[in-house]
Regions:
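Core catalytic alpha/beta fold that binds nucleotide/phospho-ligands
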Residues: 1-121
């Protein structure tokens, strides 16, 4: 689980701009966030999801996991999910992770993400 300040994310994006966005978010995530009525909230929620994933995995952003190895997407019904690439995907395979569930919510100045992982039997 991760809680993030939307105002803090806004300050980071305004200060660092594309340099920060290109380091943390995939091109698809950046396009989606920029189209939202509240783009800073969208960036904040995706950032929280990546942090929550790394915490649920038990490693943080170590062992070579890059921010862009974790992509937040929405299925056709709007349900959020995570798509993994590179080292993040490799570590999940090594650990036998067979399912990842993501919940996102925001209210006022804060966004929260919760990630639950399933391990195969």
């Amino acid at each position: 689980m991760d809680l993030v300040s939307i105002r803090r994310m806004e300050k980071v994006v305004l200060t660092w701009g594309d340099r920060f966005i290109k380091r943390v978010f995939t091109d698809q995530e950046a396009r989606i966030c920029r189209r939202r009525p509240a783009p800073h909230a969208a960036f904040a929620l995706r950032f929280a999801a990546k942090e929550a994933f790394s915490k649920a995995l038990g490693l943080g952003m170590r062992r070579g996991i890059r921010w862009r190895d974790i992509e937040v997407f929405n299925d056709p019904s709007g349900k959020p999910g995570l798509r993994l690439f590179g080292v993040a995907a490799d570590i999940c395979r090594e650990k036998g992770i067979t399912g990842i569930h993501l919940s996102l919510s925001d209210d006022g100045d804060y966004g929260i993400a919760m990630v639950v992982m399933e391990r195969g039997a």
